[in-house]
Amino acid sequence: MKHLLSTQDLSLHNAIRILDTAEEMSAVGDREVKKLPALRGRTVVNLFFEDSTRTRISFEAAAKRLSADVINFAAKGSSVSKGESLKDTAQTLSAMGADAVVIRHWASGAPHRLAATDWIDAGVINAGDGTHEHPTQALLDAFTMRRHWAKLSGTPSEGADLKGMRVAIAGDVLHSRVARSNVWLLRTLGAEVTLVAPPTLLPIGVEKWPCAVSYDLDETLARGVDAVMMLRVQGERMNASFFPSTREYSRRWGFDDNRLRALDSLGMKDTIIMHPGPMNRGLEISAAAADSPRSTVLAQVRNGVSVRMAALYLLLSGDTRETAAPPVLAAAGTAHSTKESI
């Protein structure tokens, strides 16, 4: 594939291909030497115009496990803070021979802009743009759900979709790029998605999204869910009051201890609790819920490296076959020079 900009761009075939490749990549983390020579000699640039810890480190770990060279670029303290444009920055990176650019930007659409221009001849991965999308987060979430879904059914996760899985995504949907990417990807994979939020934290036009909408978390849980994903309340993006108080928000839309107990009383022993991180403990999720056996928070972080390894590998390996993902662990020593669309 040439770029990874949006989950809306992914067909069912391509989404499963990335997830299946990630399954193979996950085996690398269990080896004594956690490295493959697949991208040796390639340069991956992490171009971050917004602060990030887990996403940047995850991409860095993914690239290094594939033996790529990594350049970390932060806007703070760089020429960008002195007024350098995205175009000038991209052309500078091109002159340095970047093969892939992982970009996080405060402006929605910035990764698409970079990919659509001739400023740089490199693959572009969207690591989060404004409130628009965060495709690799959605992919790692789907990877985590698919493993859980396969475990329950006693079948291999490779090649599987999420048909029939019921997923609730609750919280600050308005400011969440994670919610947007998850809605599109999960529907592509066959899951049934319900967004749960106060009316003030739902975007205009949400009724046109391929999902159901609810204002009541308890009612949604009572109808039955296989996974509930809590979204962080993004206070840094709020310039007005979107709910009466943090206490009221937690009581009505947070996953607190009472709702954790309710899963047991409702007979939902296999329901998992997810969070893309970072968490506001005590606000959208209680400490007990975050640390419970149902929580997949740490699994999501771990799976993120595998998914990002898969994305980088498919972006830079030049593999254009329309069949299932190749046996990466056996063939990872060969990485070609072309970058084509899937």
UniProtKB/Swiss-Prot annotation:
Ligand binding (L-aspartate): 82, 177, 232
Pathway, per record: Pyrimidine metabolism; UMP biosynthesis via de novo pathway; (S)-dihydroorotate from bicarbonate: step 2/3
GO molecular function: amino acid binding; aspartate carbamoyltransferase activity
PROSITE patterns: CARBAMOYLTRANSFERASE
Top-rank taxon, per record: Bacteria
A single GO BP: 'de novo' pyrimidine nucleobase biosynthetic process
InterPro entries, A to Z: Asp/Orn_carbamoyltranf_P-bd (IPR006132), Asp/Orn_carbamoylTrfase (IPR006130), Asp/Orn_carbamoylTrfase_sf (IPR036901), Asp_carbamoyltransf (IPR002082), Asp_carbamoyltransf_Asp/Orn-bd (IPR006131)
Catalytic activity, EC: 2.1.3.2
Free-text function comment from the UniProt entry: Catalyzes the condensation of carbamoyl phosphate and aspartate to form carbamoyl aspartate and inorganic phosphate, the committed step in the de novo pyrimidine nucleotide biosynthesis pathway.
Assigned keywords, A-Z: Pyrimidine biosynthesis, Transferase
Binding residue positions for carbamoyl phosphate: 54-55, 104, 134, 137, 277-278
UniProt keyword annotation of Transit peptide present: no
GO CC entries: cytosol
Subunit composition and interactions: Heterododecamer (2C3:3R2) of six catalytic PyrB chains organized as two trimers (C3), and six regulatory PyrI chains organized as three dimers (R2).
Protein family membership: Belongs to the aspartate/ornithine carbamoyltransferase superfamily. ATCase family.
Name listed for the protein in its UniProt record: Aspartate carbamoyltransferase catalytic subunit
Gene: pyrB
Catalytic activity line of the entry: carbamoyl phosphate + L-aspartate = N-carbamoyl-L-aspartate + phosphate + H(+)
Native organism: Pseudarthrobacter chlorophenolicus (strain ATCC 700700 / DSM 12829 / CIP 107037 / JCM 12360 / KCTC 9906 / NCIMB 13794 / A6)
